[in-house]
């Protein structure tokens, strides 16, 4: 891991280098994705079947072979162990409860001239959620993407999940059952994104696509944005831990590992006010890494993008955190709620030594789909509001038409838009 000290003259340069990440789009990936999207848009189900058989090594004869029914999802739920059933239901219940509190409501008021103004909230009609399949299967992603849509009132939630070599993950399908997914298609990659965006003979066009995926899925989401909405194009996972030395070093070490084990380009950063404590955490990491099944990935991640930063105090730690704008921020300090008030930019803030980031990933309640790559400066976690729309309401009274008409007429003439002005004037006495 890199070692930085805010008192060093080259600290700012070192911090910028630490956060630098090459996000340039791969031209070859973009070309392949463009061809796939165009083909699926043109040939629909036939193209989808061909690409699925090619990339996932399946043997689908027709689109019916790529459809899972509610009975299939229920059967998957029944096959998993009881403790896993309970865990899925507990997580779903907590996520639902949290996202119910995010739900936007319609409102209106009447001004002094009798004109009604307001905002009408409506859910999206149909959404698609992409879930990685095969060995890298994440049932938690199903719950985090589907449950907010369900809470928002989306009538049709369509899930696509690849099944390499026909391998279905029962826990993922059980999560779909628990989270209220309407339909499931066993397709993945750019071809699945294209099918959701443009529609095929069998897969209906959706209004928005959410969910994580590989580079081809990310490129496809970028390409279809505008035809449909998307949640975000997420970068590598990140964690930043601010520690005052009161949390056991082993706990912090494992929290850093929890993000580093995602992949070799994930980023784990520890900010501390004591060099002795940073050394203690480093020693814990050296000891605990021996027990990690994904040791190679963790070591590569920490070596590539990990860091320990020594600061003079917690105020400085918060300033640096706001600059980094991490996906996950752990405030492993005393009085965490007070320090949280100093945080302006973070996807999720985990307060106190008992609030491990992994609890938020799975079952605390808030969404684990979070902005990465410093985008927390201007964006937010996935939520119920992402599956709702706002429409403005205006009902002008006869009296209001006189006052507003005069104002609108003057402004319209100022813009040389005569029809606009006349439309307002016709309603004036």
Curated annotation (Swiss-Prot):
Report which superkingdom the organism of origin falls in.
Bacteria
Q: Which UniProt keywords apply?
A: Amino-acid biosynthesis, Histidine biosynthesis, Metal-binding, NAD, Oxidoreductase, Zinc
Q: Quote the record's cofactor note.
A: Binds 1 zinc ion per subunit.
Q: Which PROSITE patterns match?
A: HISOL_DEHYDROGENASE
Positions of disulphide bridges = none
Q: Which residues bind NAD(+)?
A: 130, 191, 214
Q: Which residues does the record give as substrate binding sites?
A: 237, 259, 262, 328, 361, 415, 420
What Pfam families does UniProt report for this protein, alphabetically? Histidinol_dh
The record lists the catalysed reaction(s) as: L-histidinol + 2 NAD(+) + H2O = L-histidine + 2 NADH + 3 H(+)
Enzyme Commission (EC) number: 1.1.1.23
**What does the record give as its pathway?**
Amino-acid biosynthesis; L-histidine biosynthesis; L-histidine from 5-phospho-alpha-D-ribose 1-diphosphate: step 9/9
Top EC class for this record: oxidoreductase
Q: Which GO terms describe its cellular component?
A: cytosol
One of the entry's Gene Ontology molecular-function terms is: histidinol dehydrogenase activity
Residues forming the catalytic site: 327 (proton acceptor), 328 (proton acceptor)
Q: Which residues bind Zn(2+)?
A: 259, 262, 361, 420
An example Gene Ontology biological process: L-histidine biosynthetic process
Whether Metal-binding counts among this entry's keywords is yes
Q: Which family does it belong to?
A: Belongs to the histidinol dehydrogenase family.
Question: Which HAMAP family does the entry mention?
Answer: HisD
* Protein's job: Catalyzes the sequential NAD-dependent oxidations of L-histidinol to L-histidinaldehyde and then to L-histidine.
Alphabetical list of NCBIfam families matching this protein: hisD
Recorded protein name is Histidinol dehydrogenase
Species of provenance = Neisseria gonorrhoeae (strain ATCC 700825 / FA 1090)
Q: What is the lineage of its organism?
A: Bacteria, Pseudomonadati, Pseudomonadota, Betaproteobacteria, Neisseriales
> Gene that codes for this?
hisD
């Amino acid at each position: 891991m890199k070692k930085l000290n805010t008192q060093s003259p080259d600290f700012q340069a070192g911090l910028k280098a630490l956060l630098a990440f090459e996000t340039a789009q791969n031209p070859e990936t973009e070309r392949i994705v463009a061809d796939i999207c165009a083909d699926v848009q043109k040939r629909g189900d036939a193209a989808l079947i061909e690409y699925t058989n090619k990339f996932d090594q399946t043997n689908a004869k027709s689109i019916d072979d790529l459809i899972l029914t509610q009975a299939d999802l229920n059967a998957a739920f029944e096959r998993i162990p009881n403790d896993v059933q309970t865990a899925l239901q507990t997580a779903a219940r907590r996520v639902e409860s949290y996202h119910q509190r995010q739900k936007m409501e319609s409102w209106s008021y009447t001004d002094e001239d009798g004109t009604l103004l307001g905002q009408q909230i409506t859910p999206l009609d149909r959404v698609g959620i992409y879930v990685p399949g095969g060995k890298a299967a994440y049932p938690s992603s199903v719950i985090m993407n589907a449950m907010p849509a369900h809470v928002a009132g989306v009538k049709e939630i369509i899930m696509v999940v690849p099944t390499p070599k026909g391998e279905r993950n029962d826990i993922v399908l059980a999560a779909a059952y628990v989270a209220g997914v309407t339909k499931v298609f066993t397709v993945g990659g750019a071809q699945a994104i294209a099918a959701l965006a443009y529609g095929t003979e069998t897969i209906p066009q959706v209004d928005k696509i959410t969910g994580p995926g590989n580079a081809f899925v990310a490129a496809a989401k970028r390409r279809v944005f505008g035809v449909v909405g998307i949640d975000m194009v997420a970068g590598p996972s990140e964690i930043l831990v601010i520690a005052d030395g009161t949390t056991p070093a082993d706990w912090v070490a494992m929290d850093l590992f929890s993000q580093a084990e995602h992949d070799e380009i994930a980023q784990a950063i520890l900010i501390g006010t004591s060099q002795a404590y940073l050394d203690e955490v480093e020693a814990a990491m050296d000891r605990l890494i021996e027990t990690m099944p994904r040791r190679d990935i963790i070591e590569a991640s920490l070596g590539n993008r990990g860091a320990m930063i020594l600061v003079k105090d917690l105020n400085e730690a918060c300033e640096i955190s706001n600059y980094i704008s991490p996906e996950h921020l752990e405030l492993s300090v005393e009085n965490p709620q007070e320090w949280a008030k100093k945080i302006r930019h973070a996807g999720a803030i985990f307060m106190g030594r008992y609030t491990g980031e992994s609890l938020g990933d799975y079952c605390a309640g808030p969404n684990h789909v979070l902005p990465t790559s410093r985008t927390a400066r201007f964006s937010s976690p996935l939520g119920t509001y992402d599956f709702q729309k706002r429409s403005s309401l205006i009902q002008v009274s006869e009296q209001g038409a006189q006052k507003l008409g005069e104002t609108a007429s003057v402004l319209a003439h100022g813009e040389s838009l005569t029809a606009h002005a006349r439309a307002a004037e016709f309603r004036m006495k």
